[in-house]
Amino acid sequence: MRKGIYHLVKQIVVLFYYLMCNLCPVKQNRIVFDSSLGKSYSGNPKHIYEYLMANGYDLNWDCIWFYENEKYNIPGMSRQVRYGRLRYLYYMATAKVWVFDTRQPEFLLRRKGTYYIQTWHGTPLKKLALDMEDVFMVGESDIDSYKEHFTKNVHTWDFLISQNPFSSETFRRAFDFHKEMLEYGYPRNDILFWENTTEGIRSFKRKLGLPEDKKIILYAPTWRDDE
């Protein structure tokens, strides 16, 4: 019974999204942003948005941020819409540009006239997607099914941001991505260069209470969604 209701609701959601795509025009000045499926305000989408805001683009563009549970403290003139709700589907259907850092639900096909910028969220030092031999992720257990769904999702991307030639090569192979690779570096890393000055380093150490005369080593193991 519960499973049947779930599938019925899913069909209604999909139908609503397709109706929005067919009935509502694309808003030429609308950009939607999403980090980790609405779970955070962070990563590359955050820093792309804040660059646009710093240069005044949020005054002329309708910038929409999706959130999962609670709204975030987002600067500028953006609006926030709860992830997965009907308004979310409407803004997805009518946006000119999507800026996301992870895969979206498979039924959310990018319509004609919309551009999808996939920023991704890390350097491919571990095996990804088609390079994987096993899958241990929440909601995923069959590697063949995982690869099939991943490939379908990738084929909706128009642009993929890459950090360096190594990442570009790995992404093309592991994601089966054949469209435009934006090998510009990650927007979230720009601050590491902008503030990489003697005074910037001292200020950072003082803020964290670290000794100014010592080198600092950061241990940051990769995140796993099954842990």
Residue ranges and their predicted role:
Residues 90-92, 109, 153, 210:
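Structural alpha-helical scaffold elements that stabilize or flank donor/cofactor-binding regions
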Residues 60-68, 97-100, 160-162:
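Short, hydrophobic beta-strand segments that form beta-sheet elements in well-ordered domains
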Residues 101, 107, 111-199:
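Active-site-proximal region of nucleotide-activated glycan assembly enzymes
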Residues 1-86:
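N-terminal pre-catalytic "stem/leader" segment of glycosyltransferase-like enzymes
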Residues 24-31, 113, 212-215:
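A short, charged/proline- and glycine-enriched loop
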Residues 31-34, 90-102:
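Short N-terminal targeting/anchoring amphipathic segment
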Residues 40-54, 174, 187-227:
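Conserved catalytic-core segment of nucleotide-activated headgroup transferases in glycan assembly
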Residues 50-58, 93-94, 106-116:
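Glycosyltransferases and closely related glycan-assembly transferases
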